[in-house]
Amino acid sequence: MAGLALSATTAHADEGMWTLYNLPQAVYEQMQAEGFTLPYGSLYSNPDAIKNAVVNFSGYCSGVVVSPDGLVFTNHHCGFEGIRSHSTVDHDYMLNGFFAKSFAEELPNENMFVSFMKEQKDITAHMEALRIHDWSNARQEEMIDSVANAMTDSIKKIDPTLHITVEPFYEGNKYYATTYQDFTDLRLVFTVPKSMGKFGGETDNWMWPRQTCDFSVFRIYADPKTNGPAAYSKDNVPYRPKHWAPVSMDGYKDGDFAMTVGYPGSTERYLSSYGIEEMRDAQNAPRAQVRGVKQAVMLRHMRASEAVRIKYDSKYAQSSNYWKNSIGMNKCIDSVGIVQMKRDYEAKIKHYQDSTGFLKGRLNIKHLGDLYANRHKDMKDMLLFNETFRRTNELTSRAINFAQGLIAVKNPKAKAEKQYAMFDDNSDTWDADLDREVMAALLKNYAEHVDKADLPEFYNDINTKWGGDYQKFTDYLWNNSILMKKKAKIFVNSDKVKNDPAVKYGEQLLTVMKNLHKKLAESIDEIDEQERLLCEAKVRMEQDMPHYSDANFTMRLSYGQVGGYLLDGKPSGYYTTAESIVEKMKRGKENFEYEAEPIMQELMSASDFGPYTDKTTGKMQLCFLTNNDITGGNSGSPIFDGKGQLIGLAFDGNWDSLSGDIWFDSKLARCIGVDVRYMVYLMDRWGHADRLLEEMGVVKVKKGF
């Protein structure tokens, strides 16, 4: 047990999400032994370093530059909101796909960007000189922001297009400063139809075998004079990157070296056994339950209306992804016995502490368990509140935002009685019938899972005035609140607004939310400090071994091999083929998530795939498995071979990897990637995107077919 527990955060075999600027030499040498052929400097420091081709995609995914004119590959689900924003019932790019036949046809996107990491360095000594650990969490965050702002101000004097963030690593035992350059003129160039980009939908999400062609293509535009970042302008030109990833058509075989570089969002592998119990019981379980209720309503409305589907496809996908993740993670926690493994390992740390005196009087693992036990109910109630009331329907979102004062007064210099606020018209992003039904269903569900004494005041009205009918209460608010009137002036100081039913509803929700935050604040600082010390003790106990920090949406490298695993006791295989997607397409009438257009069925049923056929297997390969260490945020991460060439994009993990955020098991956890040859095949044979193929340097493949 202890040996297994050790692998939770100490690097064994190919485990780890490594920062590139200080990659341990031992890790690099292991990469070489497994097939990486490039010099150490090719990862971070050289002008043509791999880091210069990898981007943070819009703050939630990863991507890779693949051409000298700034083409970016990312996942279809990462670009999905951009695709949705351009879609209408008449021009449904989500459903039917899109290809810009010229630069002029490439579509700009609001609120999307790519960010290049320019530099990273350790500033722990500076933060410790500020005695950062002497302060509360809230004060620590203020100090981190202050340092980052000061560093940004300094670097902007040298280059105004740069900014710096400061992040804690190793549970706050280290601090790194990272310099970024953001490009905000990002345009949609190519996307496959939803039938292929989301093939298998929720049925296949987190599952293997997989056939999804999960990719989309964007282009970075830059200032024509400086090649630097610029706000959108028709005068901007394609960005000329320092380095781009060469696209490989050579494929891979079982055991080949594979490396991901991207932006994993969050892991908690140093988390205590008590923290894992809380995650399982007070977070994952209620999250899955509430989202199940919400998603059932959403899906029914989406299936009934194309217009509603366009509005909610992205919202549904985001919700259902972590609904299924929560279910799978809990099953893995229990089936693997992770809590007990962690408990056994904590006993080992306690023995080390007792024998050495390290952190004596500071780290108290038993006390940490008591702290978690005392806040369990409040944490679960907070999760239920957030899943029920935060961003689940338009009225509740507006009510809470208004109560928090987040809607700016339009005329602050006017007399108090004349001051008004106004909500932006976002009616193209929501549907009243769907939102009303979701709101009523979640109100009812919340009452069934929270103690009566902890419910907001308006539940008394639901029972006394509305006879317990949640839909009638919901409809009353929607029909009678000024918050839902399009372009209405909301005179914030008027008695009418103060007595508005949805305004009161929002204020009562805010009261509950503040009370929950207050309760949780009583223990959060002490819990976080004990978790930090637990991490410090672990690293000290294993100081002769390399350690990687938990993911925090900074660039990380993971290396491993192409290969399958045992799935239900049988070999899983390490790739899928065109034949397998055709078999699923035949079941489209039984499961709408396997439906595909006739042209896609024809393309995937071809008798000869020409140069897209794998030379080793003789098959057209679609998706493949590696044991790279990934998590959310790695979506769109390039998968490189040992020569630094692009062989695919990471887009998912398997069901058995769902405890990977807290525990990595290289025998079970797998990264699912979409084969770049599959991507190029559809760009070629479906999209006829010759100009993009030539731009990426795969024109010879096109002509050879």
Residue ranges of each PLM-predicted region?
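Bacterial N-terminal signal peptides
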Residues: 1-7
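Terminal presequence/propeptide segments associated with secretion/organelle targeting
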Residues: 8-705
